[in-house]
Swiss-Prot record:
Predominant location: cytoplasm
Protein name according to UniProt: TBC1 domain family member 31
Job of this protein: Molecular adapter which is involved in cilium biogenesis. Part of a functional complex including OFD1 a centriolar protein involved in cilium assembly. Could regulate the cAMP-dependent phosphorylation of OFD1, and its subsequent ubiquitination by PJA2 which ultimately leads to its proteasomal degradation.
Pfam families cross-referenced by the UniProt entry: RabGAP-TBC, WD40
GO biological process: cilium assembly
Region (Disordered): 989-1020
Gene: TBC1D31
Any Gene Ontology CC annotation: centriolar satellite
Residue spans of the WD repeats: 33-74, 75-116, 117-157, 158-200, 201-248, 249-296, 297-334
Segments forming a coiled coil: 728-861, 914-948
PROSITE patterns noted in UniProt: TBC_RABGAP, WD_REPEATS_1, WD_REPEATS_REGION
A GO molecular function held by the record: molecular adaptor activity
Amino acid sequence: MQSTDLGNKESGKIWHRKPSPATRDGIIVNIIHNTSDYHPKVLRFLNVAFDGTGDCLIAGDHQGNIYVFDLHGNRFNLVQRTAQACTALAFNLRRKSEFLVALADYSIKCFDTVTKELVSWMRGHESSVFSISVHASGKYAITTSSDTAQLWDLDTFQRKRKLNIRQSVGIQKVFFLPLSNTILSCFKDNSIFAWECDTLFCKYQLPAPPESSSILYKVFAVTRDGRILAAGGKSNHLHLWCLEARQLFRIIQMPTKVRAIRHLEFLPDSFDAGSNQVLGVLSQDGIMRFINMQTCKLLFEIGSLDEGISSSAISPHGRYIASIMENGSLNIYSVQALTQEINKPPPPLVKVIEDLPKNKLSSSDLKMKVTSGRVQQPAKSRESKMQTRILKQDLTGDFESKKNELPDGLNKKRLQILLKGYGEYPTKYRMFIWRSLLQLPENHTAFSTLIDKGTHVAFLNLQKKYPIKSRKLLRVLQRTLSALAHWSVIFSDTPYLPLLAFPFVKLFQNNQLICFEVIATLIINWCQHWFEYFPNPPINILSMIENVLAFHDKELLQHFIDHDITSQLYAWPLLETVFSEVLTREEWLKLFDNIFSNHPSFLLMTVVAYNICSRTPLLSCNLKDDFEFFFHHRNNLDINVVIRQVYHLMETTPTDIHPDSMLNVFVALTKGQYPVFNQYPKFIVDYQTQERERIRNDELDYLRERQTVEDMQAKVDQQRVEDEAWYQKQELLRKAEETRREMLLQEEEKMIQQRQRLAAVKRELKVKEMHLQDAARRRFLKLQQDQQEMELRRLDDEIGRKVYMRDREIAATARDLEMRQLELESQKRLYEKNLTENQEALAKEMRADADAYRRKVDLEEHMFHKLIEAGETQSQKTQKVIKENLAKAEQACLNTDWQIQSLHKQKCDDLQRNKCYQEVAKLLRENRRKEIEIINAMVEEEAKKWKEAEGKEFRLRSAKKASALSDASRKWFLKQEINAAVEHAENPCHKEEPRFQNEQDSSCLPRTSQLNDSSEMDPSTQISLNRRAVEWDTTGQNLIKKVRNLRQRLTARARHRCQTPHLLAA
């Protein structure tokens, strides 16, 4: 078996010499992936999948490395690093270079093996995807997780459909049937549905299996033609469903060793048209068994108890099997090599008996039983039977005994003749012949019982005494020795048992049952009387060997005696290691071909023959160390010569000293249960067991006490280390404190210097800030002055415009009055002319004229009233704006004064602090006191200002009330004038005196209100306004007086004009 380590290579050859898989295991190559980092580790393969041709496979490990293995071209390539474990793979897409991989983050990605680029990225699952099934056309794919299955279009990589289920019913598997358009969905409640791929219409549902054989399905497999469905679970039963008839047609029971089925897959055949007959069944023990569904026979199996299989994939053409092993490696098997024995042609009908060489013939060798078996011909339904014919030779006596008959049709005598002729058995059939010679019962149940007892206490630390490189070989040796110790207690105390068993364990490491039974048979037959003087070497057996050596080579024995070399040195090392230390593998196998084919005394004679054949180098040895080295190492000795010498000794040794007279004949192990082995001094073994138990208990007590002492010592050492660490830490802290103190002093000096520089910078900034504030104040005052001057100019312009408009209106009114007077004059003449003719018409006309005049006067008075109101409103607005500006200016002056005062105090404080730095604390307290006083003064000043603001607000409200009263008086005056005009129009000769009185009252009322207003405004003006405010107020009063005088003149003129028509009428 070849083994390939991928290492850190991204490409390379899979095997370096042409693979020749053995029929026994069929392994082409074993692929492992070890990293060559600082801490080497094994990267475990998790999934494997074949492409459509079957000559390429893809595999991913638990770190996300994905490799493509070309079995036809003998190349591997690293095609992708996903940086996370893959949970499922698919390599049979429409585009042959693309593959699908399901990752641990629940996503599915499509990569290209040629360009090594990402083709698409599909998301939608919320749990791990454990299955990817691709349609036969490669157009669709189904990804399955525990909670959902999703159908994808591989042309657009878009999800077409999604299968949702209840949370209580999980999904086991959803997959396409081969060569059809049907989807099969299998759920955890054993329900199986078939769906149409295009329409997702439910085609049928398989019925429930019988209750007597009901199992929970977990794994499924379908034949290539899609007709048969195999299902299995946590049982050794397999259910076979016919999907055409939709019924369960067969239940196959696996061997009792199978308790659960982990994986199922049919083995394709090129000549079965898709109706596969061989089914691979992977069970819980890691062994994949291939059975024929028709005959229910086990054809072959892969994997073992030590190298179990976790998952497998079979190529579409059925040539290769790729298996992920439990240790994380990848094994590739050749199906042709595994089925070589099955596909062998039938044995020939005629057999030829060949004569042995003449010097080997004897009368007992001429009689042979030839049985022609049954010949199977596929074209014929009948089986022809052949009778057994016996070829006999007329010789005296019946030389063949029943004791020479062996299982499986073998004969011990014929095997001995064959062995003498060729010197050894054929390598291909050696194990088979050994099993027949030793008549091994293969007690699986009894051996499993011994194995189930676990590792024996005596062999728990076997690797310390015998450090074996192969861990598998060490485990097999440990299990075999433990089984022997559980079989008989003597073997737990036998120190040389590992040496005796090791060559057989190495030879039968893949079949532990055969290994155990071979060693047990060897101990019962070829190790007779070895344990009678336990724990000493078998003195009686060594005495037999010494007697035979004394008979055949006295000189060599005398040489041993002269140099104080006993049989425990020249015989016992060979026996306890069964010659494995002094012979090569081929020599050892050839020797044991002869040992197992002869009487148990043959082993003892072999020890004598080995010494006799090595007499020349032994006679040249004089030191005991040289003798010990000779019997523990390989020597340049022909094993064929030794075997011939053994046969010579067996024939020429006298009966009285021949070991066969003292040893029993061969006895095979019993069938079903192993025999009891008690050929040892039981009281010694029991005493040793008790003593060993007592010593073990004493050792445990000693170990506990030593552990306690070690714990106490560890605590003391830990406390000492902690104390030393504490003292060191304190010393370091002290030094660090001194360093920090020096650093603090330096930092304080730097801080003082920085503070001085900062104080100087602050002073400079304060001076700059004062200059800037002063400049800003001057700029703001100038801006306010400019705005106020502009406002005054605007007010002057507005007043001028108003005066001009009033003059124009008055002139227009005068012209209107003159025109009216002319009209009246003309009317007067007309009235006087027509008075006598039409008094009534004249009176009517006069009344109409009087109404028109009254309406005109009302309109003019209304317009005049609006003009007066507009003037008063503008005057009030002007006064309000002036007052607000004055208040803001006063507040700005106060804020500036306070800031100047505060800056002056801060400057005084800075000068005082610079003069007396030593009294910093006292000055700070004084500053805080002064600051409190300043704050209190500011609060008081603020309260005063607020009080003054409230007084001003009150005076403002009073001014507004006075203005409202003035408006009301003017309105009342106008109403009185209008009423007087109306009354005058009705009766011009009466009530002239009251009107004059009212005129005086109305003229006096506004003046009084204005005087009151002036008297109310005067005190505040004298208190808070500056000279410019006084000038503004004087200008405003002058303007108001001019407006009042203008109104009086206009009123008097209007009154005079209103009186003229009445006088003329009178």
